[in-house]
């Protein structure tokens, strides 16, 4: 019988578990200056749109949207 989680979330199969040590983590970490992106001004607080899916992918951008229990809309944008 197939794993229901694998059927429901097929991308989870792409993730693998890898145990790292603290020294490995620090060796692989790129320079913070390389990771910084231009700052955008904060937008006014608004609730998440009910019509917005929890994640979207457009070209090289993955955008995750969630709403906290207090009603704050959190949007995480990853540039791939």
Curated annotation (Swiss-Prot):
Basic and acidic residues: compositionally biased ranges: 23-32
Keywords carried by this UniProt record: Early protein, Host cytoplasm, Host G2/M cell cycle arrest by virus, Host nucleus, Host-virus interaction, Modulation of host cell cycle by virus, Phosphoprotein
Domain of life: Viruses
Region named Disordered: 22-50
Gene Ontology CC annotations of this record: host cell cytoplasm; host cell nucleus
PTM comment, free text: Phosphorylated by host ERK. The phosphorylation triggers a structural change that enhances keratin binding and protein stability.
A Pfam family annotated for this UniProt entry: Pap_E4
InterPro entries: Papilloma_E4
Primary localization class, coarse: host cell
Biological process according to GO: symbiont-mediated arrest of host cell cycle during G2/M transition
Subcellular location: Host cytoplasm; Host nucleus
Task performed by this protein: Contributes to multiple aspects of the viral life cycle including viral genome amplification, suppression of suprabasal cell differentiation and egress of newly formed virions. Induces host cell cycle arrest at the G2 phase by associating with and preventing the nuclear entry of host CDK1/cyclin B1 complexes. Inhibits cellular DNA replication by preventing loading of host replication licensing proteins MCM2 and MCM7 onto chromatin. Within the cytoplasm, associates with host kinase SRPK1, a splicing factor regulator, and inhibits its activity.
Subunit structure: Assembles into oligomeric complexes. Interacts with host CDK1. Interacts with host SRPK1; this interaction may favor expression of late viral transcripts. Interacts with host cytokeratin components KRT8 and KRT18.
Family membership noted in the UniProt record: Belongs to the papillomaviridae E4 protein family.
Extra remark beyond the main annotation: The major E4 form is first synthesized as an E1^E4 fusion protein from spliced E1^E4 transcripts, such that the first few amino acids of the E4 protein are derived from the N terminus of E1.
Identification of the protein by name: Protein E4
Organism: Human papillomavirus 33
Primary gene name: E4
């Amino acid at each position: 019988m197939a794993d229901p989680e694998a059927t429901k979330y097929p991308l989870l199969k792409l993730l693998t578990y890898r145990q790292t040590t603290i020294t490995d983590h620090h060796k692989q970490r790129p320079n913070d200056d390389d990771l910084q992106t231009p700052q955008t001004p904060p937008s006014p607080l608004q609730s998440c749109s009910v019509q917005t899916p929890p994640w979207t992918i457009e070209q090289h951008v993955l955008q995750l949207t969630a709403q906290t229990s207090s009603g704050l809309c959190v949007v995480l944008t990853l540039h791939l």
